[in-house]
UniProtKB/Swiss-Prot annotation:
Gene name linked to the record: carB
Quaternary data: Composed of two chains; the small (or glutamine) chain promotes the hydrolysis of glutamine to ammonia, which is used by the large (or ammonia) chain to synthesize carbamoyl phosphate. Tetramer of heterodimers (alpha,beta)4.
Residues that, per the record, bind Mn(2+) 2: 298, 300
Organism annotation: Streptococcus pyogenes serotype M5 (strain Manfredo)
Biological role: Large subunit of the glutamine-dependent carbamoyl phosphate synthetase (CPSase). CPSase catalyzes the formation of carbamoyl phosphate from the ammonia moiety of glutamine, carbonate, and phosphate donated by ATP, constituting the first step of 2 biosynthetic pathways, one leading to arginine and/or urea and the other to pyrimidine nucleotides.
Positions of ATP 2 binding: 707, 746, 748, 752, 777-780, 820, 832
Comment, domains: The large subunit is composed of 2 ATP-grasp domains that are involved in binding the 2 ATP molecules needed for carbamoyl phosphate synthesis. The N-terminal ATP-grasp domain (referred to as the carboxyphosphate synthetic component) catalyzes the ATP-dependent phosphorylation of hydrogencarbonate to carboxyphosphate and the subsequent nucleophilic attack by ammonia to form a carbamate intermediate.
Residues holding Mn(2+) 3: 820, 832
Positions bound to ATP 1: 129, 169, 175-176, 208, 210, 215, 241-243, 284, 298
The protein, known as: Carbamoyl phosphate synthase large chain
Length: 1058
């Protein structure tokens, strides 16, 4: 069957901001799909609220709308554009839920719009727990005993019948949100109550727990002619009970017999056929390790995180082909883009092992609940490819960027056996390292298997790694041992550690014996056919398949796994940089380790190396490719941190030079540079120990801002008000980077703004100034930003532009630079300079129309701004107002305080644009899910230093019809000033405290501030948690509340008696 001619215009729904459970994999899927549909001649309309994506670039679709993904706005766009069809399956859970909402509102029927890919009935059957159960029974597919409940009492009754433990799964939620394993009635009541609230249809599935079974996933495709195939099967290292997004995963499956594989494969194909899905689908199954008994856990009737992993693991472009299937093409008439000769109907075969390890945010959230369960907590993931499991696992470990180069954390050697066993049983994000430590201590793999239910096969591989470590210890400088260790994925750094040498000694020894890695191609067919793809991984074998071309090449380093502080924005810059390199006539090579992103799509670059971003792995690629140079500006802190060691090894770093990078990062050098350039900065000093820090604070005067140098995303940054707090900070936080000193700065509580600039060394283009809504003290990544600035005088803007220019030229910046300023009493101070692409590049590129990363790359390659037709200085402002607003994932992270401060906590961003500030703010709040009713009750619980400011806000809220509620101290202050407020009870006062009022739906918003120090108190944290759990808008900075008030006031009519 060929493609459909009866539809011309297709709307694609994106997945919105990055949150835990829904990350960059949907940017990858959406980009692929839009391009595939355009390739087939359809007109594509894209709607997505996330500006930090490649998908929302103008050239990806015919029309791109960056608007809130709410029924109100999507409906408007549909009525304006009148698409013939909508493709919702590439927008994750957001896309599916939007399709359901459009259907329920009657919009699809009313406008005669068809849903492509997955029919509504299939979404319903896969997502609605009751219908899913019925379908499985019809297909004779086993599922765990379960019941659907709409109340907590129903859950309790069922659990009493079948016994504990049970699993709670809310319907229509993402990444296991609201679910969990319950081993007691108390846990069941709590989790079910929460789950029912989070489910849009107030429905939960309560099922018998099959924790301990093997968790297996099949990624399947089907077309309209009922052809179906398995693209990839994957096996979780962790048994059932831990969300697959938080599990280590291997592809292909490692421990299944042929019979088991065929049995589960048949089940998966039977399910996709019954659902009549046209496109991709993910089936999760649980297999009893001791029999042929299995259960179907769940089905995702859409492209998912696992399909991004499967695409990268096999090279088979699932999203691209799913989009083409949705418009009627069939698997037997499309060629596989990797080989160019075989058809898409040909199931991929792998002659290597792929390992995926999740990346968790607990380096940022030290107090977060780290125990893993059915609710996802990872922000991103890394993938590595090897010829054996050990090699791929160890490569993945060193890709994580958590300070390890092996499956070993040195700090664990000091813990007691008792703690070790507890951590092995109760899985946390770092269980792999505890398991490996247990094996090093001599625990048998049989003991560990009975404690963890992890398959002996996997534990035996961990044992094998430890045996190689022991062999290396016994045979120092032994060539055969070195060869063996390299074959199984050991890094030079680890071997050096064991042999008590420097990493450079191991590298020299390898080179003297011509022991280099070779690069193998990912070709989907286990080398059975010729492949055309330039997609490679390293291994220690004989035949090298990556041939150096005659063209001069440039290597771009990616940004590794997505984590808080380093998100998809850096991938955006990487992809744009590659486009510019190709346009300039060079071969563009990408090196990255993140399977979710667009940059690791093999069609983006001329060559892709899927490798860890470590000195050794990067140097190996450089030794083979001999590029003209390496670009480190677009890979965030990951790439910048490699610049020095690469430069020391004689590699050409293109763009800003290492010594200039150092002048921006090193405190003393930076201060000196600012003095020379005549640019003011907050008074500050460097300290290497407690005494120096106290001395510095005394000299500067409290409050001071303290932080380690060389960090990203405000890691371990705090505002301290007195000596005791400073001592406490130094004892707990300074370990963030021991060889670098800490910085002690005068804390200026003023207006913040930031600038991204592009420099060729002589001229500087400043696309725009972004003004932060929150004052200093909230991390720039967590602030709402406005462009163009609304409250900065022309003079201040000119000063900012002038300082930016001086900095760019004075620091010899070639390419990108980001500068942050604080303004107090009309005086502009520089807070920090980052001589690299920052997280605001995609936003600013979109709103100004300047392709910043591409221009920066052209300058890095030797062109000037004048050559490119750009003037020196501040670019003319946009006529519209644009807001960038942060998005948080607190619902997924128990015990992480949602109080905003100098350490970054947001996982993603949205954008709102319109003709006025109020309209743009309204869109931004709608897009990040902070919908506030026109009237209701608002609670104020305010620190002393901001009560006066809060009073004027409370008066304005009252004027538009809100009832003001307040805690004791705040209510008393308001009353003194003539504003009466309803008193709420102290925490623990069961009937009237804030958490209880919130739970019963009596509170529409909470304003809660904690004073300049921004540290959490227990009561405050309970209040904030209750707001997060119940989805009540919470403002921990008065500026954000003021912005929301501006929106509400603009939507109110003036009602006054005459």
């Amino acid at each position: 069957m060929s493609k459909r001619k009866d539809i011309q215009k297709i709307m694609v729904i994106g997945s919105g901001p990055i949150i835990i459970g829904q990350a960059a994999e949907f940017d990858y899927a959406g980009t692929q799909a839009c391009l595939a549909l355009k390739e087939e001649g359809y007109k594509v309309i894209l709607v997505n609220s996330n500006p930090a994506t490649i998908m929302t670039d103008k050239e990806i679709a015919d029309k791109v709308y960056i608007e809130p993904l709410t029924l109100e706005f999507v409906n408007r766009i549909i009525r304006k554009e009148r698409p013939d069809a909508i493709l919702p399956t590439l927008g994750g859970q957001t896309g599916l839920n939007m399709a359901m909402a459009l259907s329920k509102a009657g919009i699809l029927d009313d406008l005669e719009i068809e849903l492509l890919g997955t029919k509504l009935s299939a979404i319903d059957q896969a997502e609605d727990r009751d219908l899913f159960k019925q379908l499985m029974q019809e297909l004779d597919q086993p599922i765990p005993e379960s019941t659907i409940v709409k109340t907590v009492d129903e859950a309790v009754t069922f659990a009493r019948d079948i016994g504990y433990p049970v699993i709670v799964r809310p319907a229509f939620t993402l990444g296991g949100t609201g679910g969990g394993i319950c081993s007691s009635e108390e846990e069941l009541c709590e989790i079910t109550e929460n789950g029912l609230k989070l489910s849009p249809v107030t429905q939960c599935l309560i099922e018998r727990s099959i924790a301990g079974f093997k968790e297996i996933e099949y990624e399947v495709m089907r077309d309209s002619a009922d052809n179906a195939l398995v693209v990839c099967n994957m096996e979780n290292f962790d048994p059932v009970g831990i969300h697959t997004g938080d599990s280590i995963v291997f592809a292909p499956t490692q421990t299944l017999s042929d019979i088991e594989n065929q049995m589960l494969r048949d089940a998966s194909l039977k399910i996709i056929r019954a659902l009549k899905i046209e496109g991709g689908c993910n089936v999760q199954l649980a297999l009893d390790p001791y029999s042929f008994k299995y259960y179907v856990i769940e089905v995702n009737p859409r492209v998912s995180r696992s399909s991004a992993l499967a695409s990268k693991a096999t090279g088979y472009p699932i999203a691209k082909l799913a989009a083409k299937i949705a418009v009627g093409l069939t698997l037997d008439e499309m060629t596989n883009p990797i080989t160019g000769t075989t058809y898409a109907m040909f199931e991929p075969a792998l002659d290597y092992v792929v390992a995926k390890i999740p990346r968790f945010p607990f380096d940022k959230f030290e107090h977060g609940e780290r125990q893993l369960g059915t609710q996802m907590k990872a922000t991103g993931e890394v993938m590595a490819i090897g010829r054996n499991l050990e090699e791929s696992l160890l490569k993945a470990c060193r890709s994580l960027e958590i300070g390890v180069c092996h499956n070993e954390m040195t700090s664990l050697s000091n813990i007691s056996d008792e703690e070790l066993v507890t951590k092995v049983i109760k899985a946390q994000d770092d269980r792999l390292f505890y398991l490996s430590e247990a094996i090093r201590r001599g625990y048998s793999i049989e003991e560990l298997e009975s404690l963890t239910k992890i398959d002996l096969f996997f534990l035996d591989k961990l044992l094998h790694i430890v045996e190689i470590e022991q062999e290396l210890q016994m045979h120092v400088d032994h060539l055969e041992s070195l060869k063996k260790a390299k074959r199984y994925g050991f890094s030079d750094q680890k071997i050096a550690e064991i042999w008590q040498k420097d990493e450079s000694d191991i590298r020299a020894m390898r080179h003297s014996h011509s022991l280099y890695p070779v690069y193998k191609m990912v070709d989907t067919c286990a080398a059975e056919f010729d492949a055309k793809t330039p997609y490679f991984y390293s291994t220690y074998e004989l035949e090298n398949e990556s041939v150096q071309s005659n063209k001069e090449s440039i290597l771009v380093l990616g940004s590794g796994p997505i984590r808080i502080g380093q998100g998809v924005e850096f991938d955006y810059a990487t992809v744009h940089s590659v486009k510019a390199i190709q346009k300039a006539g060079y071969e563009a090579i990408i090196m990255n380790s993140n399977p979710e992103t667009v940059s690791t799509d093999f069609s983006v670059s001329d060559k892709l190396y899927f490798e860890p971003l470590t000195f050794e792995d990067v140097m190996n690629v450089i030794d083979l490719e001999q590029p003209k140079g390496v670009i480190v500006q677009f890979g965030g802190q990951t790439a910048i941190n490699l610049a020095q060691s690469l430069s020391d090894a004689g590699v050409t770093i293109l763009g800003t030079q290492v010594e200039d990078l150092d002048r921006a990062e090193d405190r003393d050098l930076f201060e000196k540079a600012l003095k020379e350039l005549g640019i003011p900065q907050p008074q500050g000093q460097t300290a290497t120990n407690e005494e120096e820090a106290l001395e510095a604070a005394k000299k500067i005067g409290f409050p001071v801002l303290v932080r380690p140098s060389y960090v990203l995303g405000g890691r371990a940054m705090e505002i301290v008000e007195n000596k005791e707090d400073l001592r406490e900070y130094i004892r707990t936080a300074v370990k963030a980077s021991p060889e670098h000193p800490i910085l002690v700065d005068s804390y200026i509580f003023g207006k913040e703004c930031e600038v991204d600039a592009i420099s060729d060394g002589k001229s500087v283009l400043i696309p725009g100034i972004m003004e932060h809504i929150e004052r200093a003290g909230v991390h720039s990544g967590d602030s709402m930003a406005v462009y163009p600035p609304q409250q900065l005088s022309k003079q201040i803007q000119e000063t900012i532009a002038e300082y930016t220019k001086r900095l760019a030229i004075g620091l010899n910046c070639i390419g990108m630079m980001n500068v942050q300023f604080v303004i107090k009493n009309e005086q502009v101070y520089v807070i920090e300079v980052n001589p690299r692409a920052s997280r605001t590049v995609p936003f600013l590129s979109k709103v100004t129309g300047i392709p910043m990363a591409q221009i920066a790359t052209k300058l890095i390659l030797g062109q000037t701004l004048k050559d490119l037709g750009y003037e020196d200085g501040l670019y003319p402002q946009s006529q519209l107002v644009h807001i960038k607003a942060p998005v948080f994932s607190f619902t997924k992270l128990a015990q992480v305080d949602s109080l905003l401060g100098p350490e970054m906590k947001s996982t993603g961003e949205v954008m709102g644009s319109d003709t006025s500030l109020e309209k743009a703010l309204y869109k931004a709040f709608e897009a990040n899910n902070s919908h506030l009713s026109e009237f209701g009750q608002i609670v104020f619980t305010i620190a002393d230093d901001s009560k006066a400011e809060a009073l004027s806000l409370a008066r304005r809220f009252k004027a538009i019809g809100y009832q003001i509620m307040a805690t004791q101290g705040t209510a008393a202050y308001f009353a003194e000033q003539g504003l009466s407020a309803c008193l709420v009870g102290k925490i623990g006062d069961a009937a009237n405290d804030i958490p209880t009022l919130v739970r019963h739906g009596h509170v529409q918003a909470i304003v809660n501030t904690v004073g300049i120090k921004r540290t959490a108190d227990k009561d405050g944290q309970m209040i904030r948690s209750s707001a997060i759990e119940q989805g009540v808008p919470l403002f921990t900075a008065l500026d954000t509340a003021k912005a929301m008030l501006t929106v509400l006031e603009s939507r109110c009519f003036n009602i006054e008696a005459i």
